[in-house]
């Protein structure tokens, strides 16, 4: 007898049902990525515009003066005050109409070929309410060199806890 009891038969049927459902589950709920080359088909930027934290930390250490990127934090002011990438500036929370208007007003004074790096880090990157509106606005304004710093989990986890340089306050 293949299944000696109702309990074993029930367990085997449950395992069979689970194994049949796994392929469907992977389509409906794909696994979270590590953030490497984090580009979804709905993201407005290309893979070439994606910056990983480790790479950007090295770039920060190697560039000074005019070759250094203009770093723009597009998240919430309180988080910026608590800690941010050195040299970053804050010009409004991009998920709000007022914040996006402040960002656009400030950035309109820069040459369109400015080397820009935008980032947030308020929450998991896939759910960030700030990064996509900021990127889209800059792109629509004609900025041609915009890169996105991908912080998969948050600024605290993916930057601070890794020991990358940080600055506090405004």
Stretches found by the model and what they are:
Residues 41-47, 92-93, 121-125:
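Second-shell loop/turn segments in exported
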Residues 75, 98-107:
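Alpha-helical scaffolding within the catalytic cores
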Residues 76-80, 95-97, 122-126, 152-156:
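Solvent-exposed loop/turn segments at secondary-structure junctions
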Residues 80-86, 159:
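Short loop/helix-cap segments at secondary-structure boundaries that form the rim of catalytic
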Residues 104-151:
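Catalytic cysteine-centered active loop of the rhodanese-like fold, especially the PTP/DSP P-loop
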Residues 158-170:
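Active-site neighborhoods of enzymes that stabilize oxyanions during catalysis
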């Amino acid at each position: 007898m293949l299944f000696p009891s109702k309990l074993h038969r029930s367990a085997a049927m449950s395992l069979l049902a689970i194994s049949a459902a796994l392929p469907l589950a992977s389509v409906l709920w794909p696994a979270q990525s590590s953030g490497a080359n984090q580009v979804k088909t709905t993201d407005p930027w290309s893979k070439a515009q994606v910056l990983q934290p480790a790479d950007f930390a090295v770039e920060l250490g190697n560039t000074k003066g005019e070759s250094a990127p203009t770093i723009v934090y597009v998240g919430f002011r309180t988080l910026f005050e608590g800690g941010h990438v050195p040299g970053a500036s804050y010009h409004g929370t991009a998920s709000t109409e007022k914040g996006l208007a402040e960002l656009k007003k400030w950035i309109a004074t820069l040459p369109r070929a400015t080397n820009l790096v935008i980032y947030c880090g308020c929450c998991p990157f896939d759910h960030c309410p700030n990064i996509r509106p900021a990127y889209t606005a800059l792109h629509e304004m004609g900025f041609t060199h915009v890169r996105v710093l991908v912080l998969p989990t948050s600024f605290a986890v993916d930057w601070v806890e890794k020991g990358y340089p940080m600055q506090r306050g405004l």
